[in-house]
Amino acid sequence: MRGGTARGIGAVTVALTLGISHGAAVAAPVVQQGGLIVVGSNVKCTVAMNDKNQGVSYTSAHCGSNGDRVTVKGAEGLTGTFIPSPLYRDEEDYTANDWAMVVWDNGVALGPNWLSGDTLISPGTTLTSKDRVCTYGGVTKAKRCGSFAARLGNTVFSTLPDGQAGDSGAPVWVEGKGVIGPYSGVSNISSSSGVRGLSRAVHPEDGRDYGTDEEIEVLKRWFHIDGPVVHTAERPVETAANAGAQLGKRLDSLSSEDDSAVRGVLPVVLAIVLGVLVAAAPDIVSIVESWRSIAAARGQ
């Protein structure tokens, strides 16, 4: 019963968001470059690139585990299987070979690579700081660009802005040259001068393994930092846990606004969020209901 309710609420939410009226003709859904997918039960990531000939799409390896089932956000009939690079290791601060493919089930249609084109550049392609590197996250929903910084194994570092939770796997391309691969996150080093970081993108083919020490040296050279540093590697996936944290922050923000505005906006926010979260992760319904109670108490 809960699964049927989730699908119903999710469909209503998508229809309201897109402004689809009853009886209107709707095109058959396809897997979109830059679109959102759900890996396993609740991990949200972005499609980097579609390969129509092979019937696969690329995304980040840290989005799931081998064999996880994948659905397209808002079009749950489009399903496939998640296969990460066999060389990827799901370890803290490990970033090498962070790519995966989704092998789609028979009959799933793949859309064009409308952001980047179909050219996939090889790891040996020469890039310089003059090359404009861009991305488009499924959550950010905006084209953002920076410049090439460095390369380590099959990972390319650039000055792209940080992504939001859910942007993992987003397409990263070099304008005029082609696609690098999926967006992997941001690698940071902290020192007495502050925190500095570079964004990562990974060519979707197995490359040389490397460790944290090598990545630290790449960052220190780029930022001209000597001395000890602390390294962290961020991965912008969205799960039920961090989606809830983001919603909590939004509710806190709303509570500080004019009371009448809160009463008008809060029900709409909760309705949309409830549909999305229930469709993605039924087990968090009780959490959302708790937020409703808190919001109602604030409005009294």
Place the predicted regions along the sequence by residue.
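C-terminal subregion of chymotrypsin/trypsin-like serine protease catalytic domains
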Residues: 174-281, 287
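Active-site region of chymotrypsin-like
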Residues: 30-43, 109-119, 139-224
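Solvent-exposed, acidic/flexible segments
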Residues: 95, 120-127, 165-166, 266, ...
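Hydrophobic/aromatic ligand-binding patch that stacks against planar heteroaromatic rings
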Residues: 17, 49, 171
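C-terminal region of N-terminal signal peptides and the immediate post-cleavage residues
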Residues: 19-33, 256-262, 280-300
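Serine endopeptidase catalytic core focused on the charge-relay Asp
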Residues: 41-150, 174-175
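Secretory targeting and sorting signals
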Residues: 1-27
